[in-house]
């Protein structure tokens, strides 16, 4: 084999390996990517069905229902404009309460319910995930305090 042919073969193998590695990395990244949606966006059918997503908002007052024979809980998450029913089979966080902020991760079913695999409650009265805060500010339900630029101030997520 001539040196030039050997060099071209080596370059082709290296480029092929890099391409394969990039393809595998992008596939893994896409499989682990989870987008955030508000109840209004879910009800407007902007969220994918049967793909992992996160929804966030407030637990609607009077909506929490617990099944007696299991750990399954049903509740509604609202952004004050729309609500979506969430089903969760597990133990809820200690800070989970009606009227408090919550982020649920799971899948939107064809039945219109959100089937959560994880429920996160905010950990003090000033904390709200940045995505949820921005979404509430967009629909005019944020804290309403204008900042120096005239837009509502947002609470920083730590």
Swiss-Prot record:
Q: According to the UniProt topology, which residue ranges lie Periplasmic?
A: 29-158
Which keywords appear in this protein's UniProt record, sorted alphabetically? Cell inner membrane, Cell membrane, Cytochrome c-type biogenesis, Heme, Iron, Membrane, Metal-binding, Signal-anchor, Transmembrane, Transmembrane helix
Which sequence ranges are listed under topological domain Cytoplasmic?
1-7
Q: How does it sit in the membrane?
A: Single-pass type II membrane protein
Could you tell me which residues belong to the region Disordered? 138-158
**GO process annotations (BP):** cytochrome complex assembly
GO cellular component annotations of the record: plasma membrane
What InterPro entries does the database record attribute to this sequence?
CcmE (IPR004329), CcmE-like_sf (IPR036127), NA-bd_OB-fold (IPR012340)
Q: Where in the cell is it found?
A: Cell inner membrane
Q: Which residues are listed as membrane-spanning?
A: 8-28
Annotated GO MF terms: heme binding; metal ion binding
Name the Pfam families for this protein.
Answer: CcmE
**Main location group:** membrane
Instruction: Indicate which residues the UniProt annotation says bind heme.
Output: 123, 127
Q: Does the keyword Transmembrane helix apply?
A: yes
Family to which the UniProt record says this protein belongs: Belongs to the CcmE/CycJ family.
What is the purpose of this protein? Heme chaperone required for the biogenesis of c-type cytochromes. Transiently binds heme delivered by CcmC and transfers the heme to apo-cytochromes in a process facilitated by CcmF and CcmH.
Protein name in the entry? Cytochrome c-type biogenesis protein CcmE
Source species of the chain: Alkalilimnicola ehrlichii (strain ATCC BAA-1101 / DSM 17681 / MLHE-1)
């Amino acid at each position: 084999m001539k040196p030039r042919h050997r060099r071209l073969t080596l370059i082709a193998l290296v480029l092929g390996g890099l391409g394969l590695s990039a393809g595998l990395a992008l596939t893994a990244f896409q499989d682990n990517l989870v987008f955030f949606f508000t109840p209004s966006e879910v009800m407007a059918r902007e969220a994918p069905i049967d793909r992992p997503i996160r929804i966030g908002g407030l637990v609607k007052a009077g909506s929490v229902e617990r099944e007696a024979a299991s750990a399954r809980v049903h509740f509604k998450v609202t952004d004050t404009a729309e609500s979506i029913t969430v089903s969760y089979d597990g133990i809820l966080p200690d800070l989970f309460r009606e009227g408090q902020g919550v982020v649920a991760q799971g899948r939107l079913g064809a039945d219109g319910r959100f089937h959560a695999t994880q429920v996160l409650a905010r950990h003090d009265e000033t904390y709200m995930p940045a995505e949820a805060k921005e979404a509430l500010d967009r629909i005019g339900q944020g804290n309403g305090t204008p900042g120096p630029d005239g837009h509502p101030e947002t609470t920083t997520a730590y």
